[in-house]
């Protein structure tokens, strides 16, 4: 005959239980089989740690290529981010000439600012007040949205 060992919980005066409520050392009872370090290593480059703050001393390589060009030997080549934006602009039909790239970005920016200023200056008309008009009478025979009836004759 086998016996079941019963464990005591956290309080030695409590009643017997077949569950361990907390491991003897305290904390988590999840173990991977090896000793884990007491503190988590601090990551230097967190993605969302400093979105609008001061720029870091060593920004990641993708940030260098998307922002201002570095003084390295890559001044003549376009960055991958620029090529992606060109392809998306070309597919939208707004940007077809790839040679005047710098001028086009400036024109788009000034056009956007001009449109934004015009939108801010326009007064928003008040919502029209619905007049108490009786709704149109519902016809006795309704057609489906396609306009053709599904009624089969003869």
Curated annotation (Swiss-Prot):
<feature type="modified residue" description="N-acetylthreonine; in Hematological and neurological expressed 1 protein, N-terminally processed">
    <location>
        <position position="2"/>
    </location>
</feature>
<feature type="modified residue" description="Phosphoserine">
    <location>
        <position position="71"/>
    </location>
</feature>
<feature type="compositionally biased region" description="Basic and acidic residues">
    <location>
        <begin position="96"/>
        <end position="108"/>
    </location>
</feature>
<feature type="modified residue" description="Phosphoserine">
    <location>
        <position position="88"/>
    </location>
</feature>
<dbReference type="GO" id="GO:0005829">
    <property type="term" value="C:cytosol"/>
</dbReference>
<dbReference type="Pfam" id="PF17054">
    <property type="entry name" value="JUPITER"/>
</dbReference>
<keyword id="KW-0963">Cytoplasm</keyword>
<feature type="compositionally biased region" description="Pro residues">
    <location>
        <begin position="125"/>
        <end position="138"/>
    </location>
</feature>
<feature type="modified residue" description="Phosphoserine">
    <location>
        <position position="28"/>
    </location>
</feature>
<dbReference type="GO" id="GO:0005654">
    <property type="term" value="C:nucleoplasm"/>
</dbReference>
<protein>
    <recommendedName>
        <fullName>Jupiter microtubule associated homolog 1</fullName>
    </recommendedName>
</protein>
<comment type="subunit">
    <text>Interacts with the complex composed, at least, of APC, CTNNB1 and GSK3B; the interaction takes place with the inactive form of GSK3B (phosphorylated at 'Ser-9').</text>
</comment>
<feature type="compositionally biased region" description="Polar residues">
    <location>
        <begin position="1"/>
        <end position="19"/>
    </location>
</feature>
<dbReference type="GO" id="GO:0015630">
    <property type="term" value="C:microtubule cytoskeleton"/>
</dbReference>
<comment type="function">
    <text>Modulates negatively AKT-mediated GSK3B signaling. Induces CTNNB1 'Ser-33' phosphorylation and degradation through the suppression of the inhibitory 'Ser-9' phosphorylation of GSK3B, which represses the function of the APC:CTNNB1:GSK3B complex and the interaction with CDH1/E-cadherin in adherent junctions. Plays a role in the regulation of cell cycle and cell adhesion. Has an inhibitory role on AR-signaling pathway through the induction of receptor proteasomal degradation.</text>
</comment>
<feature type="modified residue" description="Phosphoserine">
    <location>
        <position position="31"/>
    </location>
</feature>
<keyword id="KW-0597">Phosphoprotein</keyword>
<feature type="modified residue" description="N-acetylmethionine">
    <location>
        <position position="1"/>
    </location>
</feature>
<dbReference type="InterPro" id="IPR033335">
    <property type="entry name" value="JUPITER"/>
</dbReference>
<dbReference type="GO" id="GO:0045171">
    <property type="term" value="C:intercellular bridge"/>
</dbReference>
<feature type="region of interest" description="Disordered">
    <location>
        <begin position="1"/>
        <end position="154"/>
    </location>
</feature>
<feature type="modified residue" description="Phosphoserine">
    <location>
        <position position="92"/>
    </location>
</feature>
<feature type="modified residue" description="Phosphoserine">
    <location>
        <position position="131"/>
    </location>
</feature>
<keyword id="KW-0539">Nucleus</keyword>
<feature type="compositionally biased region" description="Polar residues">
    <location>
        <begin position="79"/>
        <end position="91"/>
    </location>
</feature>
<comment type="similarity">
    <text>Belongs to the JUPITER family.</text>
</comment>
<feature type="modified residue" description="Phosphothreonine">
    <location>
        <position position="54"/>
    </location>
</feature>
<feature type="modified residue" description="N6-acetyllysine">
    <location>
        <position position="148"/>
    </location>
</feature>
<keyword id="KW-0007">Acetylation</keyword>
<feature type="modified residue" description="Phosphoserine">
    <location>
        <position position="87"/>
    </location>
</feature>
